[in-house]
Amino acid sequence: MAFYGYYYPSRWNDLIGNEQRAFCRSLYRFKEGKIHGIEFFKACMAALETEDRPYHVMFMPCSNGAKYVRRFKRLHGYIGKHRPELTSGLHDVDVFKPRESLHAVKGGEKRVLERNYRITGDIEGKEIVIVDDVITTGQSLTDYRKEIERCGGKVVAVIFYGKTVTMPPLLLIKAAVWGKHLIS
């Protein structure tokens, strides 16, 4: 697994520096399809040391088909034009109905995933690299990987634009601060 940077939810905007805030804005722009994400893709593929292997790149389904195409169409085009060793799986997935956006759903790991997609392409025997915007709990990734494997593909790597930073419980933060204060 590779990721390009750390994602801080917008509620922490006042607690992070300008550089991190700029990264988070770029991630939002990627999610909205306003930037292509090619630099993130290239950096993560290089970090994985894929060595020009003939991987099939599949993109994580979104909450609706329009978002899916908008978010990943330029990476799909880049792969087709500039990465002859790779194939794009953009059209291997049919996002057939809308669902609530997972980041908007409260409850984190307790949420029940509603599968709003089906794999329609022939991925039998292909080595798959999954691309997504953000990893938080990994629940949707696990579900997607299982579905890919059920259809005969083998997931060999996953790349994310960002990894959500999780804060430790407030009690642990207070204990660490007070512990250092009491020792000194």
Positions of PLM-derived features:
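Active-site-facing substrate-recognition patch
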Residues: 1-56, 94-124, 164
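Short glycine-rich phosphate-binding loop at a beta-alpha junction
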Residues: 54-64
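Substrate-recognition/cap helix-loop segment adjacent to the acidic, metal-dependent catalytic center
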Residues: 68-87
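A short acidic, glycine/proline-enriched capping/turn motif at secondary-structure boundaries
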Residues: 63-66, 97
